[in-house]
Design a protein with these regions (language model features):
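Short, flexible helix/strand-to-coil boundary loops that buttress conserved ligand/catalytic motifs
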Residues: 1, 35, 126
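Conserved catalytic-core segment of NTP-binding enzymes
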Residues: 8-117
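Short, glycine-rich, amphipathic interfacial segments at transmembrane boundaries or analogous
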Residues: 118-124
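C-terminal alpha-helix
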Residues: 147-158
Length: 158
């Protein structure tokens, strides 16, 4: 990576700050250069957690990375909260990981009340190149994303 490359996205997004209330950058679940760029450019980060066996280790690693980025590249970076995604509430693993997240971070990091369920609707909407609100507007997953949007808007208004 060339020098200063971790600030490339920040310089591209800077002119947009006055035009938009929110700019959302969705990165893949890795700690590669795109994720570091997104963290260097962000005011806040919403950490998504897929309740699988290695989720807690990955969550701890990501929080450490956020702290490093805050110390080295973006001192104003804040954690907006933790969002549980791809959850199947019928499984014990989902329940256990959700409880672990609550026990480990409640009172330290906001845990969003909205929980995004695991469903084929998301993948189908991507396949058909349609926003979820058009492809499956009445679905549970769409309602949870609406709920999350309300939570974020209410949080920003505080």
């Amino acid at each position: 990576m060339e020098m200063g490359a971790e600030k490339m996205l920040a310089s591209i997004l800077e002119p947009l700050r006055d035009r938009y209330d929110f700019v959302i950058v969705d990165t893949c679940p890795s700690l590669g250069s795109l994720t570091i760029n997104a963290l260097a450019a962000a005011d806040e980060v919403m950490i998504t957690v897929n309740p699988q066996l290695l989720a807690m280790m990955g969550l701890q690693d990501f929080i450490r990375t956020v702290k490093k980025v805050r110390n080295r590249l973006n001192e104003s970076l804040r954690i907006a909260g933790i969002l549980l995604t791809m959850c199947d509430a019928r499984t014990n693993l989902c329940k256990v990981i959700t409880e672990q997240v609550m026990e480990a971070f409640e009172g330290q990091i906001r845990i969003f009340e909205s929980v995004i369920p695991n469903t084929v609707k998301v993948g189908e909407s991507i396949y058909y190149s349609k926003p979820l609100v058009e492809y499956a507007p009445g679905s549970k997953v769409c309602e949870m994303y609406r709920s999350l949007a309300r939570e974020v808007a209410d949080y920003e208004g505080e």
